[in-house]
Amino acid sequence: MVAVTELGYLGLTVTNLDAWRSYAAEVAGMEIVDEGEGDRLYLRMDQWHHRIVLHASDSDDLAYLGWRVADPVEFDAMVAKLTAAGISLTVASEAEARERRVLGLAKLADPGGNPTEIFYGPQVDTHKPFHPGRPMYGKFVTGSEGIGHCILRQDDVPAAAAFYGLLGLRGSVEYHLQLPNGMVAQPYFMHCNERQHSVAFGLGPMEKRINHLMFEYTDLDDLGLAHDIVRARKIDVALQLGKHANDQALTFYCANPSGWLWEFGWGARKAPSQQEYYTRDIFGHGNEAAGYGMDIPLG
């Protein structure tokens, strides 16, 4: 059965490219690639041409996210599968695929209206070693696990789960979180490879399409260094350092220049083969800066 293999890339619209250039390189450690186009910057995390594209814009939000399939046969099968399910999509032109640095591309939207892309054949620049934007002890966890994970806006969780299930992701509710208003939050997590989850939703109403992007370091010291830099620069921290119950990653959440969150992490376990749910995190993740959509009782 055809299925996506990883969350391969993201495109973001940003109102301040200069602030992002500093944040991505000096705080996160990503490599900045400026090809002189004027309206965009590319962020590298490994030997791919890029994992993130920053598009200069008058808004700050998710522009698109790309899900990878293995090859052109799988690509055609996925297009046929989605079309048969009644999902409207457009197979992109060769020029559009070249702009994304891939061999094949289809464009559609998920049930939350998030621009979604299916692709195969990313450009991988093995002749250009990854050079982090600041000193790093290790690397980013990418490879077959993709860029990381993101939490997206979805008003209809069952419809979103069905859509991502059609793409080949698996998962379910992984937390029951008692809220101060008496309600119980039940966020939904889904995976398509060994990464514990690649997409999640069900946090309730969101101003932007995306709540946060999580990426992971291979070395704990890089997480600690990033945490020190964030604190020294007085960047808003929405959730303090803590350890999740589901992926068991040590992480913290801080604001990026676009006013939503990046989750910096280390040490996540692999995706489980059977479903579990939790009522709180292992430790930490106390709420700090409010207003970023993560004012939930994880600790």
UniProtKB/Swiss-Prot annotation:
Domain (VOC) ranges: 6-121, 146-267
Protein's UniProt name: Biphenyl-2,3-diol 1,2-dioxygenase
Pathway connected to this protein: Xenobiotic degradation; biphenyl degradation; 2-hydroxy-2,4-pentadienoate and benzoate from biphenyl: step 3/4
Keyword Metal-binding: yes
UniProt EC number: 1.13.11.39
Cofactor(s) the protein requires to work: Fe(2+)
Family annotation (Gene3D superfamilies): 2,3-Dihydroxybiphenyl 1,2-Dioxygenase, domain 1
Organism: Sphingomonas paucimobilis
GO biological process, one term: xenobiotic catabolic process
Disulfide-linked positions: none
Residues reported in the UniProt entry to bind Fe cation: H149, H212, E263
InterPro entries: DiOHbiphenyl_dOase, Glyas_Bleomycin-R_OHBP_Dase, Glyas_Fos-R_dOase_dom, VOC, Xdiol_ring_cleave_dOase_1/2
Subunit: Homooctamer.
